[in-house]
Amino acid sequence: MRPEEWIQLRFGWLKRHIYSEKNEITTFMIRDARQVSEMNFELYEEEYRPLKKGDMYFTPDGTAFIKADYELPAHLEGKKYCFLLKTAAEMIVKVNGVYAGGIDPNRERLNLSDYADGRQLHFEIMGYNRSKPDDERNPESLSVRGCRQIFEGGYIAVVNEAVQSLVYDIEMLLDAALSEVFGEDFSAMVIRGLDAALNLIDFDNLCDDDVRAASKYIDENIFANKDYKGSGKVALVAHSHLDIAYYWRRIHAVQKNLRTVLIQLRLMDKYPDFKYAHTQAHTYETVEKYYPEIFEELKKRIAEGRFEPVGAMYVEPDCNIPACESLIRQCLYGQSYFREKFGLTVNNCWLPDVFGNSWILPQILQKSGVDYFVSNKMSTWNDTNRFPHNNFIWKGIDGSEVYACVPPTHFITWNMPSQVQENWDAYQDKNEGGQTLQMFGYGDGGSGATEEMVELMHRFEKLSVMPETEHTTGSDFLKKNFDGNEKLATWDGELYLEMHRGTFTTKSKLKAYNRKLEFMLRDAELLSTLRIKNGEKYPAEKLREIYKKLMINQFHDILPGSHITPVYRDAMADYEQMEKVLFEIIGSGSEYFNTLNFQRKSIAFIPDKNGNITRKGEKGFFTKPDISALSNGKIENKKGNGDWIKVNGETVETPFYSIEFAPDGSILSLRDKELCREWVKGDFNKLKMYHDTPGNYDAWDILPNYKDRPCEISLKKPLEFIGADAQCAEFSVTLATEKSKWQMIIRLFRDSRGIEIENIVDWNEKHKLVKAEYGCNVLSRELVCDTSAGIIRRETHRNTSWQQARFEVCHHKWCDMAEQGGGVALINEGKYGVSAEGSTMALSLLRATIRPDPTSDMGTHNFCYMIYPHAGDAVSAEINNIAFEYNVPLRRTDVQCTLPDFGRLWLQAVKLSENGKYIVVRLCEQNGERGVVNLPEKAAVLNMLEDEIGETDKIEYSPFEIITLGFRM
């Protein structure tokens, strides 16, 4: 047996003596339940039943209510004792009506003597039966596996403090010695010392004197040995990442959050120096709403500066797919909550687990009272390149700058010496960045720091071989290491994560619905604001609650699609309810209102039960509206025949194009009559399907070699001409695989250069990816993409590993590939993933992942996108405006607009301010231009939190700038 094995064996013997006394509680009773809402449960049994040691307990993905009564032995009254229960579930424990704390797989005991008076103890336990994320659990299909467990009993126990202290010492030293990060000589010294110390203990007749002798030996021979010098400075911030939905529903996160908060509060009771950072205003809101007594306790710790709200946002959203205004509202509603409840403006954005960060974020943060940005995955999860900085300055699309921290190791650690050293070793800004940040605490399902982590932290200073550590708050770490630091490097660009690229496409219905609701909310707020002049009351609370619900569903494991089936159903139910309320707010009328702040020039589909076109299951007609910006107008279905188009088999002539189709609907030639050029080079409008088996992170990832495994799509019904009216001509083709059917309706227009593709899909695949590919006859080395608040240009060559890693990127309403003189745009209604190489771009349409949701994306789909060849580049062709027209329908409502003309600035939002004093107007420069807009009256200049910071009657804007104005009521 090797020396370290002999040490570990005796260490196991020692841990058996942590409890000097254990008294079993034999009166446990249980009844099972299913959680149906945040605080409501469906009980499976009318009465409690006995729960004995050795019984199986908990139902799949279920809740259990457990109770017990116990009379404390007389000799323990007034002494320190604890409640001991080992479980794989997540438990919230009340004793004599007091919340004593939480028990879960990461901790098995609660100190009770400070929370329970007298000898009579009444236990009330609520437990949720969790499963590890890697067990491929689906609550509806797995009825047993990974869900039930054996009850190991509950005890009133007394901790032998001498043994426990020695256990912490050895735990820390073994980790340091066996990890190899501190060197062989140090490891050998520790192994010799531990062996000698444990030799002082008679394990057949263990006594406290032997334990104290072993501890003294370790102090004098290992901790006192300063021959081994460490280097570096590491800031330790206690934290727990809490997914508000993931492998559990949102309703379960209420108790996950409470358990986490309770655990950290109880650690603060025991350790006066302990501090903890907790994100997401929404999680504080749920404590306030459902557990007001704990919220009052929480507020006291916040006032002390020990329980620290971090992350200025309402939830930790995905930062790729939500549009600019959604991210602004995350800050507005998050900061508003922290200000109202705690008197704090949180100066940092804390998003450790998001899947990359849009280039538009720095400006949003800077104008929302946020100076610092913390994320993590780029430094720890990239699959190709090592992100070059950890502490740096992040420059946004408009030139705004925020301090940024991307710690070099994972945001979930258990605070071991080896993890601290690994963090320092991986830290890339040692000379410029000051301390490196290490978060410690269990996460994903909450839980946070443990007693062991705090005890180890207190011992770190004894190990001279370790970096210098400081337990601090998140905000103090950021202020200390960033403010005034002129040595920091600058990263100018998006924070692209070289992983999880599939989340741009997975659960495509969620993404399309989110897009639709974002624009519905914009229009509902705009129209409600305009109606104030007519004496109508602005529905502030209703709109705020809808926005909050939308923001919750933009959480980074909901909107990206990385969750179980019930989470998807909850989100879709929310979306349907939000849509219904927004329709009511938008209202109806005799005329159509153009909510865009520019004249509509593009083709539009008008729902009409008498129409002769069926689009996405709704009758209607296409027309080219002539309605000015923010104005009303009438629209008629102009009757006429299709004499504007000539069809000869698969050859088609329109006013704009000469087109040659293939039988499968792909375009062999697209000759532009106006520009006298061919647009096709290679496969164009070609559906391509690939095997999509990324491994462990099924819903998250797409592998770079997916093109190596194509799948056959057969032609079931070749292209046929359906017919034409005065404005639109339709063609249909049906494709199929062994399991799925795919109808493509191709629409050509008399008065539009756009070519619309409607897809009607019966999707029943597993591990497949479908893209629509467009090989364009343009010489371009970049793909221009919409970010929702400006444009980003991405290289389409593969010269470096950085470009090779970006084989799939996120865009918003459109992407464009152009050369001098013309290009081709792809405009979508809710598809975010796109790839581009050379002169070929491919829009990702559907995936078919099975983990964590085996039913992901299965069923019927109906979606549209548009090919738009154009003269000039994307800016001169006004592709952004065309994309807005494609995404924002005309609203049938009667209202008059009194807003001024804002020139070429996009009218992003119009709303009543949160305090009711202003009409808030948010404008965004989308094309990279400078300019001036003169206002007819003076307006307040606001930040994104709606604080007044100035006054102006003239807007001098710069590229990609977001401007917020307040017009007084």
Label each residue range with its predicted role.
Residues M1-M39, I150-W248, E518-A629, G633, ...:
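Histidine-centered catalytic/metal-binding microenvironments
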Residues C319-E340, P408-Q428, D708:
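Alpha-helical scaffold elements lining the catalytic groove of polysaccharide deacetylases
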Residues I92-P139:
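Beta-strand-rich ligand-recognition modules
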Residues E77-V95, F123, F593-T595:
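Aromatic-lined ligand-binding clefts that engage carbohydrates, nucleic acids, or primary amines
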Residues M1-L76, D683, Y690-F721:
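Extended carbohydrate-recognition surfaces in non-catalytic/accessory domains of CAZymes
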Residues I218-L236, Q255-Y271, T286-T345, W359-K367, ...:
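Catalytic alpha-helical scaffold of carbohydrate-active enzymes acting on polysaccharides/glycoconjugates
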